[in-house]
Amino acid sequence: RDLIDESEATLRAASALRQPGHFQLEAAIQSAHCQRAFTGHTPWRAVAALYQALVEHFPSTGAHIGHAVALAETGQVQAGWDRLEALSADAVARHQPYWVARAHLGRRLGRHDEAGQALDRAIGLTEDPRVRAHLLRARAGA
């Protein structure tokens, strides 16, 4: 808790400068996720807005994926799916988080075959044995 409080104070000080950079936006996203430990829920609208700023100013494949998932968590699942679909096939072909996100959003949209294929692809790209085991359990429960 003390480290989170210290991080929050640092983030507030950086925010007061009104010159958000890549790392400040990422830290703000992580801070929003930390709120779940205290409130029991993630402020997904805030997370989506922060990812929107990150995508606008510092676009990356990871930022686009995070934004897509955050949109889905605010109830805009189709919009999130559309963002995933807009990413370059070359950029995501071997990017495991993309395939996990695609599986998650596909399942929420009722695209179960596509979701299963995406999860299989994610499993094939996963090197960490614990993450792989988690994805295999998810696949078995799908």
Give names to the regions the model predicted:
Residues 5, 25, 29, 61, ...:
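Start-of-helix signal in alpha-solenoid helical-repeat scaffolds, especially tetratricopeptide repeats
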Residues 62, 91-99, 127-135:
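Boundary/linker segments of alpha-helical solenoid repeat arrays
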